[in-house]
Design a protein with these regions (language model features):
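C-terminal cap/substrate-recognition subdomain and adjoining C-terminal extension
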Residues: 1-22, 26-28, 101, 108-178
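Short glycine-rich loop/turn motifs that provide flexible caps or phosphate-binding loops at active sites
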Residues: 36, 75, 92, 137, ...
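Acidic/polar active-site rim loop that often engages polyanionic ligands
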Residues: 45-48, 81-84, 166-172
Length: 178
């Protein structure tokens, strides 16, 4: 026969990690994960915005600008770069260390509980097999790095805030925007 008896696609194995566990090993296998809506239920930026509003650490004009840009982006009227660059401006003049600490605190207080257990298991399965695991996100470092550390992901790819020689944020994003 011409292979008609071979099922295509092959039958799926049951369980979220079964296919990874049955697959090849080693760092030549890449596993790429997105952050918001994939590893995490919801959006890490929303958790940060809520926290900053509660602490009165975000001026109303900044908040309204970000909301307006987010709506315009969703409607296809603004580029994503405009939204992410506006977000970076809200921390201009602050110490990078403080913004990173804020990200860690928000992760512990709200984002850690939003990580899907099935996705955590899938990340762990890839790590057990020795795969190269990457967390790729358009979010900012202070949102992505805590999740990557928590999950033991060594390769986060995300947008990074620019700091000057004293560690003060300039309000810019390293180019190119991810």
């Amino acid at each position: 026969m011409s292979g008609l008896d071979d099922a295509y696609p092959p039958p799926r194995l049951s369980g979220p990690t079964a296919e990874v566990d049955a697959g090849p090993e080693g760092p030549d296998v890449g596993a790429f994960f997105d952050l918001d809506g994939t590893l995490v239920a919801g959006y890490t930026a929303a958790a940060q915005t809520r926290d900053r509003l509660r602490r009165r650490d975000l001026r109303m004009v900044e908040f309204l600008t970000i909301v307006d840009l987010a709506v315009q982006f969703r409607l296809g009227r603004r580029a994503f770069e405009t939204l992410i660059e506006s977000s970076a401006l809200t921390v201009k003049g602050r110490l990078a260390r403080e913004v990173d600490e804020m990200g860690e605190r928000i992760f512990r207080q709200s984002v850690a509980d939003l990580i899907y257990p099935e996705m955590r298991a899938l990340v762990r399965a890839h790590q057990r097999r020795g795969h190269t695991v990457v967390l790729s996100s358009s979010a900012l470092t202070n949102q992505v790095a805590p999740v990557a550390r928590y999950l033991g992901i060594k390769y986060p790819v995300c947008n990074r805030l620019v700091a000057d020689e004293q560690g003060i944020l300039t309000g810019e994003i390293e180019q190119p925007v991810v």
